[in-house]
Amino acid sequence: MTGTPGAATAGDGEAPERSPPFSPNYDLTGKVMLLGDSGVGKTCFLIQFKDGAFLSGTFIATVGIDSRNKVVTVDGARVKLQIWDTAGQERFRSVTHAYYRDAQALLLLYDITNQSSFDNIRAWLTEIHEYAQRDVVIMLLGNKADVSSERVIRSEDGETLAREYGVPFMETSAKTGMNVELAFLAIAKELKYRAGRQPDEPSFQIRDYVESQKKRSSCCSFV
């Protein structure tokens, strides 16, 4: 076969030009699961974080597993969060169990206007300890804080339960966006810290970080 005049061929002893290696637009990946009873607002919570929008209208329960990705920047590192939205119904629980082992962080939601969703948190935590990684990051979230007139779960009750299990806690609103981004950024900071702590880097405690940010938001009325 005759080569194109002037073009280098394999016989010329020159290596062909190669495209530069693909460089992803993130430094590390973190897999996050949203857990909790059906109707606590997991899908709306995810859409608020991903798109900055509130999914209003007729409620349609998640069937099985849905996922979305978003890259956030924390402390100069780009963290790609792979977020799995799970079905809360009992009949899909076996599907959810299959994803526990790969998750590095779990956001466990209840609805502050629904007593049973809060009562079932202990059962969810039992499942987590049975199926998830031993060092998985867990955060407890009391969602729908914007509907304060219908509240049946006090914030203090959420705080008490979180302390019992040694996990960070905050109340959130998928509708207004209150503390939604903070929850994911706290997770991203923790995963970034675990991925490669530098010798001169101060210790990072996710519970302390969440508490400091909650106080800061309260003082500045910025949520």
From Swiss-Prot:
Stretches for region Disordered: 1-22
Known role: The small GTPases Rab are key regulators of intracellular membrane trafficking, from the formation of transport vesicles to their fusion with membranes. Rabs cycle between an inactive GDP-bound form and an active GTP-bound form that is able to recruit to membranes different sets of downstream effectors directly responsible for vesicle formation, movement, tethering and fusion. Acts as an organizer for autophagosome biogenesis in a GTP-dependent manner. Involved in retinal homeostasis by autophagy regulation.
Q: State the span of motif (Switch 2).
A: 85-102
Per UniProt, subunit arrangement is:
Interacts with RIMS1. Interacts (in GDP-bound form) with RPGR, RPGR functions as guanine exchange factor (GEF).
Q: Which residues form the lipid moiety-binding region (S-geranylgeranyl cysteine)?
A: C219, C220
For this entry, the protein name equals Ras-related protein Rab-37
Q: Where is the composition biased (Low complexity)?
A: 1-13
Which cofactors does the annotated protein need, by name?
Mg(2+)
Gene name of the record: Rab37
